[in-house]
Swiss-Prot record:
TM regions (residue ranges): none
Coiled coil: 113-140, 387-416
Ranges annotated as biased composition (Low complexity): 498-510, 902-959
Keyword Transcription applies: yes
Name used for this protein in its record: 5'-3' exoribonuclease 2
Polar residues compositional bias, start-end: 882-893
Enzyme Commission numbers on file: 3.1.13.-
CDD domains: PIN_XRN1-2-like (cd18673)
Record localization: Nucleus
Region (Disordered): 498-538, 873-968
Any single GO BP term: cleavage in ITS2 between 5.8S rRNA and LSU-rRNA of tricistronic rRNA transcript (SSU-rRNA, 5.8S rRNA, LSU-rRNA)
Source organism per UniProt: Candida albicans (strain SC5314 / ATCC MYA-2876) (Yeast)
Sequence ranges of Basic and acidic residues compositional bias: 521-538
Amino acid sequence: MGVPALFRWLSRKYPKIISPVVEEEDHEIGGAKYENPNPNGEIDNLYLDMNGIVHPCSHPEHKKPPETEDEMFLDIFKYTDRVLMMARPRKVLMIAVDGVAPRAKMNQQRARRFRAAKDAELKAKQLEIEVQERELRGEIINDAIKGKKQWDSNAITPGTPFMDRLAEALRYWVAYKLSSDPGWANLQVIISDATVPGEGEHKLMSFIRSQRSDPQYDPNTKHCIYGLDADLIFLGLATHEPHFRVLREDVFASQDKKFTIKDQIADANSNGDTVAKEDKKPFLWLHVNVLREYLQVELFTPRMSFPFELERAIDDWVFLCFFAGNDFLPHLPSLDVRDNGIDTLVQCWKRSLPILKDYVTCDGKLNLKSVEVLMSNLAYKESEIFKNKHAAEQRREENNKRRKLAQEQERALKRVYSSQVSKGKDKAPLTADVNMPLMDTSGQNVEGYANLTNSDIVQNRAILTKANLANSDAAAELKKLIDSKKTQVTVVQDQIATDSSANSETTTSESELEEIQSDNSLKRKLEPEEDKQTQSDDIKLWEPGYNKRYYEAKFHCQSDEEIEQTKRDVVRHYVEGIAWVALYYYQGCPSWNWYFPYHYAPFAADFTNLEELFPEGVKFKLGEPFRPFEQLMSVLPAASGHTLPQVFRDLMSNPDSEIIDFYPEEFEIDMNGKKMSWQGIPLLPFIDEKRLLDAVQKKYELLTPDEKSRNTNKEAELFISPANKNFSKFSEKLYKENENEVTFKYAKSGLSGKIFKLGTFNPEGVFNFPLNEGYMPNVNNSDYFQAIYHFPKTKTGKSMILNGHIAPLPALTTADKNDLLYQLDKFNNRRNGGRFNSTLDNSDYINKGPAGKELYKTYSMRRGGYRSYLQYLTNGHHPDHQSQNSQYLSYGQQKPYGGQGSYNQQGYYNQQGRYNQQGNNYNQQGRYSQQSQYNQYRSNTQRFNNNQNYNQSSNNSRSGYLPPRPQR
């Protein structure tokens, strides 16, 4: 899920969650090695969301794209190896590629792929225009660039030949690394390719939940997930794992360095020698444990009728973020991450919580009454939010107008000054492009050129340029071409980088062609703003009556009665949607067939009487996932039909096809008040599942064996090296004793599950290098092991941290908490040292795990459970941590902690009514024990001491008590 601007917003509001990755440079052979200690701290399990690697490697934005698919695969190998060298997992590596998605996700996939096809078409037309413009100027363009077709990124969809080849390439690369890299000797690699249903990141989460269900699971496992989607942060929180990091590119580090059409033409003309080598993008860590600390401070709410539990509060916070944007539902009209919509919802949540009897969510299930109270609080502020957004937009537009006017005035002054200075005989020209030498057709300087004034040059440039052309009508033909296509180019102005934008600053004295370019560039800049103003004026959300106007404009309602009926239906489906998303994040996909059947969301004020809509709660039927070709037919436009088997293409392009209406060539994009075209809403028809499946399944008998194989949903595979502890057991039982399956537990290697014999794997065979380009050696199958892998049976996930965890050391100081509570220097963390100023002090940030690497040696892969580990400590082992023994013992004696199926409450009342925070226990007299680490964990909202009880603090809170505002 990509929630726009979420990562930037989080990193600004919670600055300490981000730190740069320390990357060792391999300057010489034998330099950086995988088996060496990790300078970023050790990691047990690494999870790769491979689509975050495949996309930038196959169609990069900042460098020349690969010419062939084999080049893409080699780039993927190189990129993945770089990621692994940064993370260096020691136990498990899971590689997950997006498989067939739930129906709810296909709406967004369909919109993205239709837009991608349209953008590719417009970019090809723009390249054609650019080439002809340059030829009219006398440039010689390499024939290789003319009519060149760009690689179709829509091929990165399950079921295409590209994805089949990608899976085979990944299997080879893993086998090669296991057989040749000493650092991979004990690594267990799971590959879940595009034939395994499910989105990549959610397949990773399913794996984590399955491992947590194993009684031998180590609750101090250090997890890391790589990917570009912002929802990985939510997924990390949803695991309730205390040691979790997200690894990602710093996408904002070089966002202005685009590989433009100018670069593309220059590269073709020079055979690839002129384009500068791409600088490596830096990477970032996002520390989920630090985000948990921030949320503990921000979400604490006094005066509640039930105990505050951090894990439940975090689940509610994740749920609140769904309303601001997700891949399955449109966000509420009043909420946007860029406008601090999440902060608005958190305020509503904190106001609602004291009057509720429970949290809004529990293990991914919704309390509809709590949802209704939450929405009523938001509805109370909704009209004010629209007014404030409109006022802010007006101020922004006025500021932009003033800034543009100032820039125009400055440019005018420069032109006047430049013209005056250029007339002087002893002065160098300030504008070299205006005083450029003029050549005749033989390449000689134009006679009398040195005597021409600046004005003469400008007036005669167009005539002299046209004289260089053999065809006197070429300029007129080009003008007609541009006039006919310029309106199409404007649609994707914000996605396609061009060089003609510089011409928008030219003067009216320049040539006719340059005036056309300037006009085009100006329209590309102004039209989205005009669309935005038009869309805003249609509904006028800041004026009374916006609710009725909204349903009339967006849902085409004709009467008040129809509005009410539509409103209830939209709310019903939207509540189903947020219930579906919550379960999807916490328990796995609740239904493969459910989807939201509207393009727009309701208002917060429309969420009324929810229990009447769902008297028995929200229910789902699991259903079955689509087959790969069925998803391709659901999400691809006709322009990408070449990725499908030939038998299906006629269904997408033949006017007589029974489902031709699913594949419009032209479709409306509703900007919906947004500025950038990618933010617009493509108004595509929704797929009728029954009609689609009936049409597609009629063609199955015409498929070739290879195509039938690509259209089959399959299972994950496990790879290990001969050095793995389970290698001998697996090989003997599956291939010598011919057992059907082998079950293995977590304690031996840090992984549990079942394996089955893979029919295509021969232990005595050879894995040949599958690419035609590049060279890598063939791999003997005896140097690695491969089998079908099943996750262990997963129990219902619980919103809790498992017993036996060792909490990370706190990263936030009192000043950090005050900054968050009082919003000091909000979103200005680039001051005083730049982006990472808050994490540069080593004393302020722990970058080697919760308490240093040594803490895990005695605890990792423990036998006998947590009680055995406590006994180990009490016998005098590990003297460096004797000061912590009493804390561990008091933790183990706590009565409220149950088994791993119960909630690990973050706080509860004792019999004397005193509050117990962060698991710090009381003795029998209700007083703090001497071993309590209370002072280490206290927050700014709870100022307790040994003689002050919780009720006194609550009374202070009721009277408006807050700690004194810090002086800055």
